[in-house]
């Protein structure tokens, strides 16, 4: 039996961010491999009129948990939903619930965070820094706690080219920022934000770096580890390939490309697309939880889980495979034929944005106005391009992450644990993974039926023919206008026609002689 799976048996586990993508996959893996665990505490808020228990049932109703229900039929009884608001002091947890958490928790997986690149500094600091600090304070009062696993990001120090598995200091102490945000008004905060984040590309990466500093400073005598995943993507193997449930990161790009809205991106084609499957991240998290609790390292260890240094795939290769998959399994009702042009040149990027994005959106909105409908495409396109622009920093660069601790941990696992909790990204077949990724977006995000593929292919063929006809008509009109205005253009045109006529005459004469 797996040593790691046995370790989590009988444990009480606290997961923050359990309703998010990573948190759901973590819960699924825990229940599937360690169905005899005692309880999983999840911190949630009522949402859209739902009670806490209704939110739990909604999570378990997902296809993701189908296998879990077979091995752990009473799974809903092992999830203890606790009302909490990470924006409030002490998370607004009731005294009774707090007492239960403090007295029973064995393992903490801190996954909660705001991942918005354009979030306000106040909100991002509250969730990514202050909440982490408060959770560490809670952890220090848990007598049965064995390990605290903090999930950060590989891009927390993206202002560096080479990133080691260490915690880097930030220019300003987290405590000073937390204290200053309590009395500064929003206008002043917005004004000083660019000066604070300095070389970091956005507030998200900056506050995740601050969060790591807080972990280091507030660790006390706790057994703590930090995990830094890169771009978290769809499942690779477990519980099945291609599962995804949000439109963040690559998922939104795949949808926008497959629907024909996004046809050109400012990106360096040969830059590494450092995508890491979510189940690989979860397997490392569980292995790190076991290792931290059992071996009790003297210092806080940092683990990188990235693909670029072990099994790199560049954006060009990924784009080619995504388009090839769209040919086989296209999305339904695309706006235009899917395409993906990568360019690192700013002028070329602006040209493609004007020709491939804004112009079609304006034309379509004119059509909507003429037919008495409300124009919406230009607004949607502007929002899409604004979102893509926030990703440009990451798709135009490559980083080097050291993975000494991750490789060390892999070597510490038994063959059975390496199989059950596989986080060896060197085994990943990118072509197969990308195809399953696109298929998963179609099935689980867009909720499109596979039976509709033949009809979608017909529509794609129709759009391709329209594209060719439009380009041909545009060329002929432009050429006709050019001929009418330029003697040189007329001479070139007559030369081409004359040459073609002579070539055809020669070919016909040659055929006659052979006969």
UniProtKB/Swiss-Prot annotation:
Where does the protein end up? Peroxisome membrane
Q: Which residues cross the membrane?
A: 465-484
Catalytic activity reads: a long-chain fatty acyl-CoA + 2 NADPH + 2 H(+) = a long-chain primary fatty alcohol + 2 NADP(+) + CoA; a very long-chain fatty acyl-CoA + 2 NADPH + 2 H(+) = a very long-chain primary fatty alcohol + 2 NADP(+) + CoA; an ultra-long-chain fatty acyl-CoA + 2 NADPH + 2 H(+) = an ultra long-chain primary fatty alcohol + 2 NADP(+) + CoA; hexadecanoyl-CoA + 2 NADPH + 2 H(+) = hexadecan-1-ol + 2 NADP(+) + CoA
Q: Which leading EC class covers this enzyme?
A: oxidoreductase
Membrane-protein topology: Single-pass membrane protein
EC number(s) per UniProt?
1.2.1.84
The molecular function GO annotations come to: alcohol-forming long-chain fatty acyl-CoA reductase activity; alcohol-forming very long-chain fatty acyl-CoA reductase activity; oxidoreductase activity
Cellular component, GO, one term: peroxisome
Chain ranges on the Cytoplasmic side, renumbered to this chain: 1-464
Protein name (record): Fatty acyl-CoA reductase 2
């Amino acid at each position: 039996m797996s040593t790691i799976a046995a370790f989590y048996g009988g444990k009480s586990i606290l997961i923050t961010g359990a309703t998010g993508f990573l948190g759901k996959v973590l819960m699924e893996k825990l229940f599937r491999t360690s169905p005899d665990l005692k309880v999983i505490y999840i911190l949630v808020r009522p949402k859209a009129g739902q009670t806490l228990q209704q939110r739990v049932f909604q999570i378990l109703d997902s296809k993701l948990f189908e296998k879990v229900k077979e091995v752990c039929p009473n799974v809903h009884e092992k999830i203890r939903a606790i009302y909490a608001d990470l924006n409030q002091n002490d998370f607004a947890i009731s005294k009774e619930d707090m007492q239960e958490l403090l007295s029973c928790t064995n393992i903490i997986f801190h996954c909660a965070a705001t991942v918005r690149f354009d979030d306000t500094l106040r909100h991002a600091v509250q969730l990514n820094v202050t909440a982490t600090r408060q959770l560490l304070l809670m952890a220090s009062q848990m007598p049965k706690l064995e390990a605290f696993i903090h999930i950060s990001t590989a891009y927390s120090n993206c202002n560096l080219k080479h990133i080691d598995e260490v915690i880097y200091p930030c220019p300003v102490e987290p405590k000073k920022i937390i204290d200053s945000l309590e009395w500064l008004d929003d206008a002043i905060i917005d004004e000083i934000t660019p000066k604070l984040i300095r070389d970091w590309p956005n507030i998200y990466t900056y506050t995740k770096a601050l969060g790591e500093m807080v972990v280091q400073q507030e660790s006390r005598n706790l057994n703590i580890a930090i995990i830094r995943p890169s771009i978290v993507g769809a499942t690779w193997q477990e519980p099945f390939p291609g599962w995804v449930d949000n439109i963040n990161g690559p998922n939104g790009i795949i949808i926008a490309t497959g629907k024909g809205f996004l046809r050109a991106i400012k990106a360096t084609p040969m830059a590494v697309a450092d995508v890491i499957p979510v189940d690989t991240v979860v397997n490392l998290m569980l292995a790190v939880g076991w290792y931290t609790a059992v071996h009790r390292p003297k210092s806080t260890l940092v683990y990188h889980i990235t693909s670029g240094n072990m099994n790199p795939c560049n954006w060009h290769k990924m784009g080619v495979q995504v388009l090839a998959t769209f040919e086989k399994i296209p999305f339904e009702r695309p706006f235009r034929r899917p395409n993906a042009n990568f360019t690192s040149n700013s002028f070329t990027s602006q040209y493609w944005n004007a020709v491939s994005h804004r112009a079609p959106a304006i034309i379509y909105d004119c059509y909507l106005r003429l037919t008495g409908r409300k124009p919406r495409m230009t607004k949607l396109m502007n929002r899409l391009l604004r979102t893509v622009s926030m990703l440009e920093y990451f798709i135009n660069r490559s980083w080097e992450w050291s993975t000494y601790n991750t490789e060390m941990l892999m070597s510490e696992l038994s063959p059975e644990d390496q199989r059950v909790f596989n986080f060896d990204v060197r085994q990943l077949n990118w072509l197969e993974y990308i195809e399953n990724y696109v298929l998963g977006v179609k099935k689980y995000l867009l909720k499109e039926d596979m039976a509709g593929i033949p009809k979608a292919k017909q529509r794609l063929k129709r759009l391709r023919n329209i594209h060719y006809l439009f380009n041909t008509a545009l060329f002929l009109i432009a050429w006709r206008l050019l001929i009418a205005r330029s003697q040189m253009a007329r001479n070139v045109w007559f030369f081409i026609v004359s040459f073609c006529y002579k070539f055809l005459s020669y070919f016909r004469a040659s055929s006659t002689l052979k006969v």
